[in-house]
Amino acid sequence: AMGFWQCKLRYQTQDEVLTIARRYKELNIPLSVIVIDFFHWTQQGDWRFDPEYFPDPKAMIDELHEMGVRVMISIWPTVDRTSVNYEEMSERDLLIRTDRGLNVTMECWGMQCFIDPTNPETREFVWQKAMENYRSHGVDLFWLDEAEPEYTVQDFDIYRYYDGPANECANEYPARYSQTFFDGMKKEGIENPLNLVRCAWAGSQRYGALVWSGDVPSTFTYLRYQLTAGLNMGLAGIAWWTADIGGFHGGNVHDPAFQELLMRWFQFGAFCPVMRLHGDRDPHY
């Protein structure tokens, strides 16, 4: 329904993104969306392209649009303590807090805090940064990763949200995360916003949530599991669902068994609401 989406972990430079899209065009293979994954940014929580690797994102996106390709960008809800936005967000209570110990909720190449999208001011702040640094360059869609959120320390009793203690309200996190971008895009006049998100909760469908099944292994067993996952997502009221074609990790592109799996997963993907290729393939050169 939404065409074919090209994605991988990850495109490291502007030139790499354009090289892939141009090759699709040369081969006359239809491409609807290309996805730029994580760590394209200067720092977690800056929500902007790293100019060293993406020196002219607007020119890149303009060329992609000329080819008929829309652009999706990965967003993480994490703010590193060295981010340009950390101090302001911390002072304004726009981040999830801990009621004891160090105020760090994730450690991923640094120490980070998660944004608190249950706070309306947080939703407005994050959307404004996305407007300034992504939408202004022409980015069409957002990939809302880490949406659970993925706490490094799972002592849930210590986390405090705007809406209350985590043990009482944490499940609403992915819905409010989706709402952040849905509301912003609606204000722009986009009639039916749709964004990819790694987690959902009751009511997420009202915020344009396209959920995918996460980082699943590249095996036939997990291909079979996708049938169950997709059906259950639909029964939960969320119609927009997809999976990583080929699975996310463990697939070697030179392995005939993986090549067979990839072909079969493509066949399955053609009947999903969104046909999206993604993964972290071996070998890593």
Q: How would you name each of these model-derived features?
A:
Residues A1-Y285:
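Catalytic-domain carbohydrate-binding cleft regions of carbohydrate-active enzymes
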